[in-house]
């Protein structure tokens, strides 16, 4: 065993002891107060600003004022979601079905968290874990270590007021390493990964139950029925928030040609600047230098972004983001992928159907399962996208990054981790929320038997194949004659 592995093992020992004490007696009030203590640690205005300032200083990503808003809004929304939720003991009782559901803690949860949201994402995981009676150990990105450490200090200060053990919320100490993260993944009861797709893959291969979320590459359609002015305003607000650190920030816009000129004018009024071919090539060359995103351009203010690219544009003083003309999609056109910067790629299509085809092409290149957006007055088109595109979310007439992770004016749970289903190689297709932080035990009692006849279940099939079947000789099964569960052998049931 290496020293780094031993360090993680020591965290696990302390976490398991603290979690056992915390969960003893299954006290809902204790869980609720602990969750609120963690929430107040990040939401208290002075601490929030300190964390936000530290986040930008340490990671070089985003904007302080927007991180303050994000930390507050995301945490307040989560508290709203879980405010009256029962997360321990009996959470559902259905006498008609003879079922009683009991919420149980998972135990010790590990969470690998990104540098893009070094306070908000850990806080969300911590609150959900505590709400459900768990301990949690964080593995922050190297750039986010100091922010995470400050957050935990604030949480522990709140814990002291309630007499809670600090070991309920811990972190892998600096310096971060792949060895430490791997040991954590292999040792906890559940591992949650937000951010690096390499870490997501490693989590799924660790042998531990894992929840990983997929890559973003949010792509949005503006069709010919859209309120173009409103669409441009929402897209600009979402694209520029926190300098596009969100995985839900728009990366590509697909516009139906009929409203292109009107949309570009509206986008210009919101600070979007369509680049000519020369400037666009200069931005792409700089942004994707060496085959990967340029860290000197991602999540930077627009003046820094343009300076690194060596580009000057008209009305630069009022510019908020740039628009790159798009044509191709795929590895040879990196602008069709996630950019994590104040650059938006614009595709133009003749009609809605070809726009849908373009979105599908983009998602199959990157971002499958995450989300698509639609600005339209035709709600049937939203349903069409949901039925036909490889996506877990269709965001309709909303600022994408404010909607995908939950909003006070939509029904999604507040989260910073969006599951992308099988399309994105994930085990969940929903926003990460409190239900993912608990086990459920089901008590199953006998109820009056409800066994259909063969006529009840096969009549429509027999009609469809044009055959008349005599089922009069069918066998009625007594409870003791039922076929065993398919994972148990006949030999094993013989001895029940």
What residue ranges belong to the model's regions?
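Short, flexible turn/loop "capping" segments at secondary-structure junctions
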Residues: 11-13, 212-214, 243-247, 333-340, ...
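Rossmann-like NAD(P) dinucleotide-binding subdomain of oxidoreductase/dehydrogenase enzymes
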Residues: 87-230
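Flexible, glycine/charged-enriched surface loops at secondary-structure junctions
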Residues: 24-30, 49-52, 165-168, 241-247, ...
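Conserved C-terminal structural/oligomerization subdomain of aldehyde/semialdehyde dehydrogenase
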Residues: 24-27, 312-496
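N-terminal Rossmann-like NAD(P)+-binding subdomain of aldehyde/semialdehyde dehydrogenases
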Residues: 1-100, 128, 269, 474-496
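ALDH superfamily catalytic-core signature
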Residues: 2, 8, 123-124, 200-330, ...
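Structural signal for hydrophobic packing residues in well-ordered secondary-structure cores
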Residues: 12, 16-19, 23, 35-46, ...
